[in-house]
């Protein structure tokens, strides 16, 4: 085991030393959810979110990107403009922990080592896997968690980034995640309560969304890119 660890460390160091440009950094901002409880605004960050990201710049126009994110999400019928939701009065809080991989595409060429000020809009999509608390509505109309659960989502991100030095980038992005679950708010219980029709409420034919809005800061390392054909 020690031998393999040593070989892995040597190969990793050599790879990074002779690799094309990478970026590493973090993101911070707010999150909101869209579902069967509370407001239905698409962009309404009302809870804290923080994460990290890594990019492998394969050309001046695209990069492979991986990220992690932890976001609080919540909904409160009393803050909704929908009169029926206000009268119902449900509320909940949940925590989403995600891992995402995919491709980031810039509208214009973006050299992370440019000697002049540059900027570009960008798009990102891929596949997200996330963990959250499975929830249900108890008899007293209180929504509570009862187990851990996980699901997948499709991220759809629009952003704008600029260089702030020869190896540092600052960005702003809004990213919606379409999830393959309807239980972030407890409206459609999963796992052991999946067949409990009496616990369901809202539109059970529409899955939940959650949205991250915030800034990203990344730092480039590795040699200046030569950008191969791929």
Question: How should these model regions be labeled?
Answer:
Residues 20, 44-48, 95-99, 119, ...:
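Residues that define the transmembrane beta-barrel architecture of outer-membrane proteins
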Residues 34-40, 84-92, 141-146, 200-203:
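Extracellular loop and loop/strand-boundary signature of outer-membrane beta-barrel proteins
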């Amino acid at each position: 085991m020690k031998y393999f660890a040593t070989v892995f460390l040597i190969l990793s160091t050599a790879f990074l030393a002779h690799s094309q440009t990478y970026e590493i950094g973090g993101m911070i901002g707010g999150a909101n959810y869209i579902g069967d409880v509370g407001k239905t605004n698409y962009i309404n960050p009302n809870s804290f979110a923080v994460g990290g990201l890594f990019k492998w710049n394969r050309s001046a126009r695209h990069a492979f990107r991986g990220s992690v994110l932890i976001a609080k999400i919540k909904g409160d019928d009393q803050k909704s403009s929908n009169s029926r939701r206000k009268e119902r009065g449900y509320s909940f809080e949940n925590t989403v922990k995600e891992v995402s991989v995919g491709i980031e595409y810039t509208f214009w060429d973006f050299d992370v080592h440019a000697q002049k000020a540059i900027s570009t809009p960008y798009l990102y999509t891929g596949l997200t896997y996330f963990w959250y608390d499975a929830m249900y509505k108890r008899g007293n109309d209180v929504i509570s968690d009862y187990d851990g659960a996980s699901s997948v989502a499709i991220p759809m991100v629009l952003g704008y980034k600029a260089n702030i030095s020869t190896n540092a980038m600052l960005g702003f992005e809004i990213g919606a995640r379409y999830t393959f679950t309807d239980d972030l708010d407890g409206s459609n219980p999963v796992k052991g309560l999946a067949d409990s029709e009496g616990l369901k409420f809202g539109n059970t034919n529409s899955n939940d969304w959650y949205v991250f809005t915030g800034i990203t800061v990344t730092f480039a390392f590795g040699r200046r890119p030569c950008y191969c054909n791929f």
